[in-house]
Design a protein with these regions (language model features):
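Phosphate-binding P-loop
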Residues: 1-4
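Charged, low-complexity, helix-prone segments enriched in Lys/Glu/Asp/Gln
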Residues: 28, 76-80, 84, 96, ...
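Short hydrophobic/aromatic beta-strand immediately N-terminal to the Walker A/P-loop
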Residues: 7-8
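P-loop (Walker A) phosphate-binding loop of NTP-binding proteins
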Residues: 12
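P-loop/Walker-type NTP enzyme "switch/lid" segment
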Residues: 42-121, 136-150, 173
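Conserved catalytic-core segment of NTP-binding enzymes
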Residues: 15, 19-24, 30-31, 36, ...
Length: 192
């Protein structure tokens, strides 16, 4: 089996995606691969113990010997805008505007294109890196892939078209990407 550079583990809730993602990262690390476990951060505003589950994941990964990255939409957006405009200050200002925050929430799939861009950018910058995304559900993973294609089709010119073109080209590279759909052995799971 040849190793890929980018793996997504997805499926219904409660089927063991996180356990399998962590186990796969542990396997890669034991085989001397530079592995990064990626998850969507819990961005909900909580009481004192914010993001307890995220901290537990990070601690578990650290105990197993690999790095983690919690994807935060506003941080990824700010980084993307700063790279395009060559200005951290302007990017900080833009993402704090109510207009930008509404725009991200209003346009279906935009957040997933931003996340996909962040992951692929890291993989291009570091050719030794293997990324393992623990996707919360199959809908999220599918939206991430479809949105990249949809935005590429909608914008026939400009920065977004160029960036999504690069993303699609990278995803279609042979032996680059693998989608792992985790399901319970039931008829319902097979039909879905």
């Amino acid at each position: 089996m040849s190793l890929k550079r980018f793996y997504i583990f997805t499926g219904k809730g409660g089927v063991g995606k996180t356990a399998l993602s962590l186990a796969f990262c542990s396997h890669l690390t034991e085989n001397k691969q530079n592995c990064l476990y990626i998850y969507f951060q819990n961005n909900k505003i909580q009481a004192k113990n914010t993001n307890t589950a995220d901290k537990q994941l990070e601690q578990m990964a650290m105990d197993l010997g690999f790095k983690t990255l919690g994807l935060d939409l506003m941080a990824c957006s700010q980084e993307y805008i700063a790279n395009k405009l060559k200005s951290e200050n302007i990017a900080k200002w833009i993402i704090k505007t109510p207009f930008f925050q509404s725009l991200v929430n209003m346009i279906p799939g935009l957040s997933y294109v931003i996340y996909m861009g962040k992951i692929l950018e890291m993989l291009v910058k570091d050719p030794t890196l293997t990324a393992v995304l623990d996707s919360p559900s199959s809908g999220h993973a599918l939206t991430m892939l479809e949105s990249t294609q949809n935005f590429n089709s909608i914008f026939k010119d400009g920065i977004i078209h160029e960036d999504t073109n690069l993303m699609l080209k990278e995803l279609q590279t042979q032996d680059f990407f693998k989608l792992n759909i985790i399901a319970l052995p039931t008829l319902l799971a097979l039909h879905e």
